[in-house]
Amino acid sequence: HQLIELRNNITSWVEAGEYRRRDVPYKEILETLNTDAATMRVFMKSENGMDFRSWRNKLRLQEACQMLAGHPEMNAEQISEYIGYSDSSNFHTDFRKFTGMSASEWRRTRTKTGQSN
C-alpha cells in the first residue's frame, strides 16, 4: 500500500513538472511525496534501477532532448535553465554523458532525420 501511494505521488509530482524545480532540498521533496529517505531509496532502486538524483536528472535530460528537437528557437542554455539546471556547464556535461554528444550535435542530427528522441 505504501509503495502504491508513493508511485502515485511520484507520478503526480512528475506530471506537475516538479522535477524541473532547482535547489529544492531533498528533505522537502520527500515531505511533498509523503515518504522517507529509506523508502524512497528502496523504491527508486527497485522501480528505476538508480537513485533519486540520477532518475531526476534522466527526466530532465529526456525533456531536454525533446525540447532541442521541438523548440529550435531555444538555445541549450535556455533549455538547461528551463529543465532545472542552475549551471549550464553541468547540463552540457550531463547531456554528453546521457547522449554521447553535445546538445548542438544532438539537435543537428535530430533536425536532419526528423526524430525527436
Task: List the predicted regions and their residue ranges.
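Terminal helix-turn-helix DNA-binding modules in bacterial transcription factors
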Residues: S46-I83, T109-N117
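Inter-domain helical "communication" segments and dimerization helices
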Residues: H1-T11, E15-R20, T111-N117
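N-terminal positioning helix adjacent to the helix-turn-helix/winged-helix DNA-binding module
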Residues: Q2-I10, P25, N57-R60, P72
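Basic, amphipathic alpha-helical hairpins
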Residues: N9-V24, M44, N48, C65-M74, ...
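HTH DNA-binding helix-turn interface
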Residues: A37, R41-W55, Y85-S86, F95-S104
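Helix-turn-helix
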Residues: E28-D36
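Sequence-specific DNA-binding recognition helix
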Residues: H71-R107
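The alpha-helix within a helix-turn-helix
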Residues: L30, R41, S80-E81
